[in-house]
Amino acid sequence: LSPDYETKIKINKRELLDCIDRATLLVKEGDKKPIIMNVTDENMELKINSFIGSMNENIDIAKEGKDIMIGFNPKFFIDALRVIDDEEVTLYMVNPKAPCFIRDEEEKYIYLILPVNFNAATN
């Protein structure tokens, strides 16, 4: 894993997983709506807008580095988080167009999740 990340986030895995799970309730099968993560100092705002409705939730985090707004397919994030046993996960992000890495301190696992382009004006 390259040490060139711009943003490092420590977050409670269960809180993040539950929040993304709730967001997927607003997305129909085949609908490719991304979940938008807006990361600021002590907060990650997760939002999704779909034809069914919209959601906007906040989760407390510990962040090092720059603020970032990035979009992901919620299903890919859920798939990775479900197989991690740790209570806390660490996310490493470079920019909104580069992959996000999820890994533990001992590097027993590394998950790579590709971001999704989104129009910030509509989300």
Model-derived features: where do they sit?
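Active-site loop ensemble at the mouth of alpha/beta enzyme cores that anchors a bound cofactor
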Residues: 1
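DNA polymerase processivity clamps
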Residues: 4-123
